[in-house]
């Protein structure tokens, strides 16, 4: 079974002024294409074609109940508990997929949000709303297999998703077909949180890039940086990030502002 090229969302900064959109929470994990071939074997690939099925433990086994010749588009996520809340754990996803750590496989979950082929039929040309219906009918929901939640798009609903710990939302046109590559009929809106930290050092990394080391309330935070930041060591900077991971690390963190004045710190 050939590996389909996934459809990708386009990042947007402004909310759509008009039009009919549906919304899904933006999970923070690894994109995974899961396929059931004509022999009933279940296989899984990353969006770049790396085979990952042997690193996921028993997670994919229930998918064998789906019709043969079916391909699901999913997000591989890990969930942890903190202070009674269930939170996403991207670091654990990396340990499973990149390092092959079998011990963390039981923490993995699969969230399905689209179906590309169903019982040998290519359903990508169908509108999203029809594919969503087929997905609900064909995806075998289980303890660690779930369907993405969909609802009409609104700013209020987006803000509620961010408050729940999601890194944002994905908006989709109900009539959109599934096309490979980045498309404007799928738009992602990421949350941006901000915090003030002290710039402690600027150092080159092993990859040749420059990184800034910051202190955020006694916690060490490393962000992409540049040599010019060396003149600002000891000063306050503003950090921007999308969410806090289960281990307390900041996802997609960067220095968004320097030269803060006392009024900025009040």
Task: Identify what each model region corresponds to.
Residues 1-266:
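Catalytic cores of nucleic-acid ligases and guanylyltransferases
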């Amino acid at each position: 079974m050939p590996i389909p090229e996934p459809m990708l969302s386009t990042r947007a900064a402004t909310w759509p002024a008009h039009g009919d959109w549906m919304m899904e929470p933006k999970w923070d994990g690894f994109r995974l294409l899961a396929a059931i071939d004509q022999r009933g074997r279940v296989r899984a690939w990353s969006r770049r074609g790396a085979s990952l099925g042997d690193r996921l433990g028993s997670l994919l086994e229930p998918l064998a109940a789906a019709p043969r010749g079916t391909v699901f588009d999913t997000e591989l996520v890990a969930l942890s508990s903190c202070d009674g809340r269930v939170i996403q754990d991207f670091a654990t996803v990396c340990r499973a997929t990149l390092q092959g750590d079998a011990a963390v496989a039981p923490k993995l979950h699969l969230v399905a949000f689209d179906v590309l082929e169903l019982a040998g039929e290519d359903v990508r040309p169908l509108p999203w709303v029809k594919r969503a219906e087929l997905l609900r009918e064909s995806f075998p929901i289980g303890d660690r297999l779930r369907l993405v939640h969909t609802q009409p798009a609104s700013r209020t609903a987006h803000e509620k998703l961010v408050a729940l710990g999601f890194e944002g939302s994905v908006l989709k046109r109900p009539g959109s077909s599934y096309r490979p590559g980045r498309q404007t009929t799928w738009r992602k809106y990421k949350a941006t949180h901000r915090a003030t930290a002290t710039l402690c050092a600027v150092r080159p990394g092993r990859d040749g890039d420059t990184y800034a080391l910051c202190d955020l309330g006694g916690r060490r935070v490393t962000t992409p940086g540049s040599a010019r930041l060396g003149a600002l060591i000891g000063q306050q900077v503003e950090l921007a990030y999308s969410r806090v991971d289960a281990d307390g690390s900041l996802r997609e963190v960067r220095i968004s502002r320097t030269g803060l004045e006392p009024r900025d710190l009040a």
